[in-house]
Amino acid sequence: MARPRRAREPLLVALLPLAWLAQAGLARAAGSVRLAGGLTLGGLFPVHARGAAGRACGQLKKEQGVHRLEAMLYALDRVNADPELLPGVRLGARLLDTCSRDTYALEQALSFVQALIRGRGDGDEVGVRCPGGVPPLRPAPPERVVAVVGASASSVSIMVANVLRLFAIPQISYASTAPELSDSTRYDFFSRVVPPDSYQAQAMVDIVRALGWNYVSTLASEGNYGESGVEAFVQISREAGGVCIAQSIKIPREPKPGEFSKVIRRLMETPNARGIIIFANEDDIRRVLEAARQANLTGHFLWVGSDSWGAKTSPILSLEDVAVGAITILPKRASIDGFDQYFMTRSLENNRRNIWFAEFWEENFNCKLTSSGTQSDDSTRKCTGEERIGRDSTYEQEGKVQFVIDAVYAIAHALHSMHQALCPGHTGLCPAMEPTDGRMLLQYIRAVRFNGSAGTPVMFNENGDAPGRYDIFQYQATNGSASSGGYQAVGQWAETLRLDVEALQWSGDPHEVPSSLCSLPCGPGERKKMVKGVPCCWHCEACDGYRFQVDEFTCEACPGDMRPTPNHTGCRPTPVVRLSWSSPWAAPPLLLAVLGIVATTTVVATFVRYNNTPIVRASGRELSYVLLTGIFLIYAITFLMVAEPGAAVCAARRLFLGLGTTLSYSALLTKTNRIYRIFEQGKRSVTPPPFISPTSQLVITFSLTSLQVVGMIAWLGARPPHSVIDYEEQRTVDPEQARGVLKCDMSDLSLIGCLGYSLLLMVTCTVYAIKARGVPETFNEAKPIGFTMYTTCIIWLAFVPIFFGTAQSAEKIYIQTTTLTVSLSLSASVSLGMLYVPKTYVILFHPEQNVQKRKRSLKATSTVAAPPKGEDAEAHK
């Protein structure tokens, strides 16, 4: 908010002596261009560079200084020559040199407020008197400045704006872009025809994102322009997301020797951040490029320069190879043909109003006008005055000329609108505009809208900012030569980015956009593990084992019946396997089973054929057929174990797995028990023991077997059989080897449970075989049964560790099934081989031995009771 008039009075009085001092100094220096007019505009231009120590001003700046100053003179000439714009009113000017220094510019700007200060105070108010009390002589009153065009650098504009606002003098800058100047509470009289760096920063963020970069460093010259620009870039990138700042480096205002080499070393601390965002002045840009070349990093950094770089050749002169690929941004502008015609016709004769033009002439044509000229080298030729710009020297219109012209026209249009409102129908100034109210003029300035010198609309928002419109350039080599290259337009930005990515060229592969990423993209089947505090950086973690990639941040385990795809980007069904007929694991047990069935069938057929022969009768025909049936079932169970699991097959497995062994061992147990009881009874009495008849033996055998049958039937009823697919059995470390196993719903323990009862019978039978090992030779089956049981026990003792020891194997289904069926077939083969193969051999090949023997052993006669009559007596033979 502006200060009230009373509050400003003491400040105005305090500034009065400074204004006098400034006037005196300016008069001595003759440091301004003056044009007479009814309304005077001020102008601030960096005609000279910053001076060395002890000097305010340095070398002449031909383009940024003289071109821009002449652009204002050109614009004033056009406005004053336009009968439709401010008719009867001539605009004058007072143009000052800021020498590219904010403090010096502030001293210069005090001349703009002299008229206002003089209007507020006089010699009586400040007590200034000459000897004798005579008032001092005062110079002619200065012209009243109604508005100021300038300054160039943001730091200069900020310094000047703080003074001009005190006196309500509107200010329009043609080049100051610092976001700080958008603060209308502090710089309420400041406007600009160039967009603020906040727009430029947004455009640069959009460029970075369009190139696919997410990890960049920033480089700023110390001061309002550089620091504010980087701050805006960082803030916008943080709000937009997806772009992280690796390094944020500030170049000191007065850099020490080796400072720029240090900057390059710091940038290389994060080598993946190849994109470098630069908000720096021309000199700093040049020295950064030089340091990059000295470090042999040509082509490593990907420069994105602000409008201070723009499309200028001076920052990259002789450094083109380092600048190849640099993307720069510049407020949308056009070359003004009328200014080119105007400036190229300027000469020493027709441009005496510009007090710096003679110095420009010497600098531009490398000559000297007088012995006191600025060109002090004795070898420099003398200027003839006939030199011509563009003919005898190179000429290219400076980039901000358009904006200087637009700034002048903005003030002219505002004054014209104000004149129409306050002086309707009046030619020339009316009393209502003498003096011109700065606050009212500011309102008219903010309301202007017209097509500028380049044909683009000129307007201001509530903060005095122009809309953001930028051209985007890239420095590209020509035919492989960087030195002969140039800036090529590759896009535009006006609230949204339009970038022709295909038109971009880069060192290395010209058409492949280089990367500036903290971390490379993760491959298929990998998730991002973010680095804490740096959202653009991550580590890639493989979704290993049975996990698959859900999204870029998450891995999850596949469902139990599935396994991941080879690249772990999804899940697929796990293949289902079973022990098939063609499996190598099924061949040995099937071969044994077939041979066993053939052998068993042969024995049974032989026994049936020779049913009434002594050997068959002596074997106990009834129990032999029961035992052979059990052996046959044992062999047959192999086919059930290999068959595809289903409800019927699973039920048959449960029922017959233990039935064959139970039937066999029940018969063997009954036989050994009968022999043992006969032998023991004979020791005590001649009376035979009970239940030794064939019928009794069958009853005992079937009674023992019925327990197994009843148990199995009860199990079938309690838990109906069905097949399942077990995905855990072959869930290997390598998912590619994982398989689902189709099998019956029987655990390892339940499988052994089916055989548990028969194993108990086997152990009991073995115990009786041991007890009966001392029976007389007349009981010719005692010893074969004993050998059978011993061997069977050994087989099953070997079976148990193999069966349970492979429980964790990937080949479990094959090993356990094969082990079980082979063990069953071997135990059946032992029984068949020990008990019946010898008898069959005698029956078939030695029939002469298949006769009833009459002799008895004397020992047997004297120690054993008489055996029962009939075929049981044959067992004694």
Curated annotation (Swiss-Prot):
Glycans are attached at N296, N451, N479, N567. One of its GO terms (biological process) is detection of visible light. The keyword Transmembrane helix applies. It comes from the Eukaryota. Residues 25-585, 644-654, 719-748, 807-819 are extracellular. It is a multi-pass membrane protein. The chain crosses the membrane at residues 586-608, 623-643, 655-673, 698-718, 749-770, 784-806, 820-845. Residues 856-877 are annotated as: Disordered. Homodimer. Interacts with GPR179. Interacts with photoreceptor synaptic protein LRIT1 (via its N-terminal extracellular domain). It is linked to Night blindness, congenital stationary, 1B: A non-progressive retinal disorder characterized by impaired night vision. Congenital stationary night blindness type 1B is an autosomal recessive form associated with a negative electroretinogram waveform. Patients are night blind from an early age, and when maximally dark-adapted, they could perceive lights only with an intensity equal to or slightly dimmer than that normally detected by the cone system. This is Metabotropic glutamate receptor 6. It comes from Homo sapiens. The gene is GRM6.
